[in-house]
């Protein structure tokens, strides 16, 4: 019989790496009044580049009564295979309209991303086939960019399921590269030191490693010893009265009937605190997060029998009946006891770093040469600018000189003075100006000839 969808888990995909079947699950009890929690926990980001679109689609689908009923009767396989997607044809018009708008917004967002990507890599005038590029986004149907159809929901479910399943592997690969880079830098640092300094640095490193290894025994995650320790130290209960069912209910924080990945990882905190302390120089918090992920994967592998990334009460109780539950041997092997890389992998990584460094150096050299060329060009432009300014100044000065030479002279009071022509008769000076001239030299104006007077009698 297929496993039914767990009730009360509408947002379980949104904690990192959970299946979409958990996301779309809804509470069975319709009579239960909605709980108003003003301080509700914000749903964590899945890390998917379409996380917001996924969250909004889920929120809209939850508002449709028909779809919720079908979800209650569905199983994880129906959801993952896309069978449930066909029920989208029966949702209300209002819900379909909202889904259509969400898809148009997502297509618009992806187009903007593509444009930015192409602008950064290619010539600005290059024509881009956005329709073809949209096909690389597998969580929606690029052939229909305006309406949200059953195919869109099917693609969204399948893509999210696949991407989330690959998330852990990507995290492990990232951690491996982090560890290799750390070792590479450590070796380069030691090579840069003198012999005495190198010996001192190596001694200090060995001392840090020794302190890091000195910690209490770490219990195997999911074992009886590990769960009892949580029961006693975290829950404050009597270890002799350990009850798996009660334990499950206590740590099902959101009371949805399953332990999701975040709820499981919370159980490992006490074990991690035995090994890692943020105050200690020798303890790497990146290693602690890798340790947490490895612990969760171990529990899921041994307890999550249907591999839906959720632990039901039945699965949890069944795991407590196995022999491995009580027999943990020497305990859990931590990260430093299980190297993340081999020497051969480190060698290839260093070759890759060397090639990248050479490429960056060549690029830096080209940029330096271009900068120098630009500097020389700038100097030439500045010199030409100064020459042009000097030429303009000289032209202005010459123009001013020409204007001064062509203008008539002015009297002391600023009035213009015009010169008389030399060929004209001299103009006598005003009377006031002749007072200093000798009387003998003064010219008397000639009198007109006197006409004879006629006698009126002769007329």
Curated annotation (Swiss-Prot):
Region named Disordered: 192-220, 368-459
Signal sequence region: 1-25
SUPFAM superfamilies in the record: EF-hand
Gene Ontology terms for molecular function: calcium ion binding; DNA binding; G-protein alpha-subunit binding; guanyl-nucleotide exchange factor activity
Biased composition (Basic and acidic residues): 192-209, 377-388, 433-445
Domain of life assignment: Eukaryota
Known role: Major calcium-binding protein of the Golgi which may have a role in calcium homeostasis. Acts as a non-receptor guanine nucleotide exchange factor which binds to and activates alpha subunits of guanine nucleotide-binding proteins (G proteins).
Other comments on record: Discovered as DNA-binding protein in the serum of lupus-prone mice.
Protein name: Nucleobindin-1
């Amino acid at each position: 019989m297929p496993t039914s969808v767990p009730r009360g888990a509408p947002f379980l995909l949104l904690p990192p790496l959970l299946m979409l079947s958990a996301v779309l699950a809804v509470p069975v009890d319709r009579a239960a009044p909605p709980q108003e929690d003003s301080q509700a926990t914000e749903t964590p980001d899945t890390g998917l580049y379409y996380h917001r679109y996924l969250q909004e689609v889920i929120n809209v689908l939850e508002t449709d009564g028909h779809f919720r009923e079908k979800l209650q009767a569905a199983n994880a396989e129906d959801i993952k295979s896309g069978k449930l997607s066909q029920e989208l044809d029966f949702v209300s018009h209002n819900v379909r309209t909202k889904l259509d708008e969400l898809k148009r917004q997502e297509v618009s967002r992806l187009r903007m991303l593509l444009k930015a990507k192409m602008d950064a890599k290619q010539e600005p005038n290059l024509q881009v086939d956005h329709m073809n590029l949209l096909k690389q986004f597998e969580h929606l149907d690029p052939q229909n960019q305006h309406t949200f159809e059953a195919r869109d929901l099917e693609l969204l479910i399948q893509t999210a399921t696949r991407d989330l399943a690959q998330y852990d592997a990507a995290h492990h690969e990232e951690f491996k590269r982090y560890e290799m880079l750390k070792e590479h830098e450590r070796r380069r640092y030691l090579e840069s030191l003198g012999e005495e300094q190198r010996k001192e640095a190596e001694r200090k490193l060995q001392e840090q490693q020794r302190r890091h290894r000195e910690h209490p025994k770490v219990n195997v995650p999911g074992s009886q010893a590990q769960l009892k320790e949580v029961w006693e130290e975290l829950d404050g209960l009597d270890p002799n009265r350990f009850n798996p069912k009660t334990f499950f209910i206590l740590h099902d924080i959101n009371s949805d009937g399953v332990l999701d990945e975040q709820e499981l990882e919370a159980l490992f905190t006490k074990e991690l605190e035995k090994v890692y302390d943020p105050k200690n120089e020798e303890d790497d918090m990146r290693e602690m997060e890798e340790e947490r992920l490895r612990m969760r994967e171990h529990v899921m592998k041994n307890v999550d029998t249907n591999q839906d990334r959720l632990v039901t009460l039945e699965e949890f109780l069944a795991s407590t009946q196995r022999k491995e539950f009580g027999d943990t041997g020497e305990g859990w092997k931590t990260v430093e006891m299980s190297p993340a890389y081999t020497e051969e992998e480190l060698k290839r990584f260093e070759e890759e770093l060397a090639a990248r460094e050479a490429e960056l150096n060549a690029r830096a050299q080209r940029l330096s040469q271009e900068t120098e060329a630009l500097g020389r060009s700038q100097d030439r432009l500045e010199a030409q600018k100064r020459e042009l300014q000097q030429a303009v100044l000289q032209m202005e000065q010459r123009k001013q000189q020409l204007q001064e030479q062509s203008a008539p002279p002015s009297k002391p009071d600023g009035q213009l003075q015009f010169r008389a022509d030399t060929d004209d008769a001299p103009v006598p000076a005003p009377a006031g100006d002749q007072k200093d001239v000798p009387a003998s030299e003064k010219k008397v104006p000639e009198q007109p000839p006197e006409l004879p007077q006629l006698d009126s009698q002769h007329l």
